[in-house]
Amino acid sequence: MQGPAVFIDAEIDDQAQELRQFLKGLGAEISEEKSTKGIEDDLHKIIGVCDVCFKDNTHSPEEIDAVLNSIVSIIVSIPLERGENLILSFCDKMTKAKETSLARVCLQSLWRLFSNLEVTSPLRYHVYYHLVQVAKQVNQVKEVFTGVEQLKAQFAQCPPSNEQMQKLYRLLHDVLKDSNSELASKVMIELLGTYTAENASYAREDAMKCIVTALADPNTFLLDPLLSLKPVRFLEGELIHDLLSVFVSEKLPSYLEFYKNHKEFVNSQGLNHEQNIKKMRLLSFMQLAESNSEMTFQQLQDELQIKEEEVEPFIIEVLKTKLVRARMDQRARKVHISSTMHRTFGRPQWQQLRDLLLSWKSNLTLVQENINTVSAAQMELAQRQ
């Protein structure tokens, strides 16, 4: 076995020749001599055969990493206006590694390339797109994507086009849907937000995916905002929109009736009926808590269609979500509600919030007046003494 293939300390032309020799030694169809057309032609030919590294069993991932690192160091030295095809070709090659250990090396190489490109370079988008693809392959998506705000910040200096962001959001949703449904749901909502009134009708498939992802996510309970998204509005009158409306504002019996009439549709969307029931019970509890400061266990049994021995475990599960603040009285077989998140937040809720804030303001004004009165009395008493 040869020693580590390190090229970074050499001049660019020398690096290119050593890379040619190394790749030819692995069986690549490339000459050992430098191109007479210059470094860009050298790099074009080197990138064209660099995936031969992924078929070689005589070099460690660390050695392959050194080779790819050398290629990256040459790429970033090429002027941006002449490097686009080279970067796109290199990114494509990095998706070819089959073995997990080598795919991780490719991920590192793409990250180096992404990090070393100017933040104003439009090519960073293309590198990042391939970065996500490879991250999915090695189950390391969380290393390159932590949230929509972080993503926007990365491209703040050179925002991708609307179409590019839609393509990226679709990829991220596909990557996240099985491992992080909550984040996948947020990505899909962001995707739908990129559509305008003019093109919302073309977002049918994205809108349906967004709804299904949100319904399937066990941690997404505030579904009302989806109804205001333009692409979702275009689905009004269709079964998927009707199902969303049930989850937004109806109770468990409405869902059970919908499932009874449209069982095949629900199953065809990949939704789990038992998980849907579990979610609808929690949403129904939230709705009951909005108008009831206390509820008996028997009331919960009837409303949520659960057995007597299931009531206490259910309440505990509700409290774990922190959507409802409550106290369970096992002796009296009641639950006392302190507060709950509203399933919908429309004009009545805004009015309620306004009234509450005005009440606080009035109380604080009264407290301040009382303090001023006491303070004035103390000052007057002190002056008399």
From Swiss-Prot:
Q: Which GO terms describe its molecular function?
A: translation initiation factor activity
Name its cellular compartments.
Cytoplasm
What the protein does?
Component of the eukaryotic translation initiation factor 3 (eIF-3) complex, which is involved in protein synthesis of a specialized repertoire of mRNAs and, together with other initiation factors, stimulates binding of mRNA and methionyl-tRNAi to the 40S ribosome. The eIF-3 complex specifically targets and initiates translation of a subset of mRNAs involved in cell proliferation.
Q: GO cellular component terms?
A: eukaryotic 43S preinitiation complex; eukaryotic 48S preinitiation complex; eukaryotic translation initiation factor 3 complex; eukaryotic translation initiation factor 3 complex, eIF3m
Entry keyword annotation includes Protein biosynthesis: yes
Q: What does the similarity note say?
A: Belongs to the eIF-3 subunit M family.
Write the protein's name. Answer: Eukaryotic translation initiation factor 3 subunit M
- UniProt-listed HAMAP family: eIF3m
Gene Ontology annotations of biological process type: cytoplasmic translational initiation; formation of cytoplasmic translation initiation complex
UniProt cross-references to Pfam families, sorted A to Z: eIF3m_C_helix (PF18005), PCI (PF01399)
Where is it predominantly found? Answer: cytoplasm
Which keywords are on file for this protein? Answer: Cytoplasm, Initiation factor, Protein biosynthesis
Which stretches make up the PCI domain?
Answer: 180-342
Subunit relationships: Component of the eukaryotic translation initiation factor 3 (eIF-3) complex.
